[in-house]
Amino acid sequence: MSAFRVAIITASDKGYAGQREDLSGPAIREIVEANGYEVTHTVILPDDREMLAAEIARICDEDVADLLLTTGGTGFSPRDCMPEATLSVVERAVPGIPEAMRLFSLKYSQRSMLSRAAAGIRRRTLVVNLPGSPKAVRENLEYAIPTLAHGLEMLRGEGSADCAR
């Protein structure tokens, strides 16, 4: 089995404008590479629903990655739109992933219940929204990545077809 390919989208108006350094995207890269995944694409985009949706769709449709991880845009700010962009282009929602991450994160911060993160599948790519803070990215991704690997194997037609075990 070859390494899973990962694309990373950071949603940040200030990051896109060069006014803030992206720390969450590199945190994602560090974690996935430490787990044997290959990062094939990274991009910083503004909090613009249409731009984000178009990039998510392009990555999935052009088979750029097996796993697309996004960071940022999942909160209550008026410009936060990553879940809406994600859900507008995925073909199948996977609500259990963000539900589990929110539940896990409650032990670190009650504010995690304010996350609007979403997840879904388009073609053969799993799309997962992560929080915008590097600390929350690490907590969520380190928790979820072992289970995500099983889902990715299933999308590839490898491994057990049993989600329940």
Where are these regions (language model features)?
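Non-catalytic beta/alpha edge segments that cap or flank active sites
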Residues: M1-R165
